[in-house]
Amino acid sequence: MNTDEGINPLDLAREVEDLGIESIFLPDHSHVPVRRSAVYGGPRGIFPDSPGDMPREYYRNRDQLVTLAAMGAVTSTLKLGTGVCVVVQRDPIQLAKELASIDEMSSGRLLFGVGAGAPWNIEEMSNHGTDVRTRTALMRERIEAIRTIWTAEQAEFHGTHVDFDPIFSWPKPSRTPHPPILMGGDGPTVLDRVLAHADGWMPGHLDETFDGLEDRIVELRERATACGRDPIEVTIYLGRITHIEEYIRMGADRVVFTLPTGPVEETRMFLATVADLARQTV
């Protein structure tokens, strides 16, 4: 996460691009409720290294889209990713314009990672008026509404959760037909959502095992071929440097590592390590 206690985001973007790293992804948390009913990571303990309260970075991360726009303004090749955008907490009409503006101003460098939020983060969603029980259906409709706004001169959408009559909305994204949509998540039906609503899958690697992840990558690509889809891009999120060979063997197209918040020199050392790793695996 990029916070007000770490490296300046514009310096970070320039250095990442200068090192030849392909992309940068930013998370999306608008706030942290003071009172929360669930433990960070949820009952399954999906973040075993950070039990209990949320890490400090969650409280201090900058706005995702504002920061990506600023990063795009000081770079020319760096891809700008939402990792992920919690679309159930954002108005779809406004979000479509914000994302299209970033893509248009950056000459087509946006990667739109999407997610429905986690149930352990229920209070944050509730403060935005989102019902955690219907968040996945809401996410699906908002993705399709955004896609419609991006691709239609007069866009309209009529669903259960999103409903609007014809509208004009510019700019349109620079990328045609639109920026790649990367579906986050690891649940039992996520592959269905990838095939129905996205161009790629963005699973998190949350433990030390690989069998389940590898099997699902194979399944996803077999299903994509069977239904005539183009190859599905796989971006491993929350990747671990020590496992890079396994990610390559499984056929991952991209690995996103978590940049620790710390002194600037430590950040630069971490970036140099990632850049060296990227050069070795090309």
Predicted regions and their residues:
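Active-site-adjacent structural elements that line small-molecule/cofactor binding pockets in enzymes
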Residues: 1-282
